[in-house]
Amino acid sequence: MDMMLMIGNYFSGVLIAGIILLILSCIFAFIDFSKSTSPTRTWKVLSIMSFILGIIITVGMLIYSMWGKHCAPHRVSGVIHTNHSDISVN
């Protein structure tokens, strides 16, 4: 299955997963900072990794939605056919 088609089918699920990862990064950071003992590396790594993955997924979904609105293949080919004569398209 094509990756873009799969993302198009599960767009809202992937976007929600990115938002959940951002929320989890905040929770992990809160757990790490609220402890009175010295912080452990596990909570820091979980917080940083979930933040990075959440940002990548969320920004990727925004870029994908803009690609679908402005650069989808059926839109681009439609613009080419309406702006040019049949001779120049061939």
Swiss-Prot record:
Intravirion side: 1-10, 66-90
Summary of the function given for this chain in its UniProt record: Envelope protein which is a major component of the mature virion (MV) membrane. Essential for membrane biogenesis. Is required, together with OPG144, to form bona fide crescents, which can progress to form the immature virion (IV) membrane. OPG140 and OPG144 form a lattice that is stabilized by disulfide bonds and serves as an anchor within the viral membrane to which several other proteins important in virion structure and morphogenesis attach.
Stretches assigned to coiled coil: none
Key word Disulfide bond present: yes
Transmembrane segments: 11-31, 45-65
Residues modified as Phosphoserine: S85
Family classification: Belongs to the orthopoxvirus OPG140 family.
Ranges in the topological domain labelled Virion surface: 32-44
This protein's UniProt keywords: Disulfide bond, Membrane, Phosphoprotein, Transmembrane, Transmembrane helix, Viral envelope protein, Virion
Species classification: Viruses, Varidnaviria, Bamfordvirae, Nucleocytoviricota, Pokkesviricetes
Organism: Variola virus (isolate Human/India/Ind3/1967) (VARV)
Subcellular location: Virion membrane
Modification note: Phosphorylated by viral OPG054 kinase, phosphorylation state is regulated by OPG106 phosphatase.
Any one GO CC term of the record: membrane
InterPro entries: Poxvirus_A14 (IPR008785)
Origin superkingdom: Viruses
Gene responsible for this protein: OPG140
Assembly description: Homodimer; disulfide-linked. Interacts with OPG144.
Its membrane topology: Multi-pass membrane protein
Protein name listed in UniProt: Virion membrane protein OPG140
A Pfam family annotated for this UniProt entry: Pox_A14
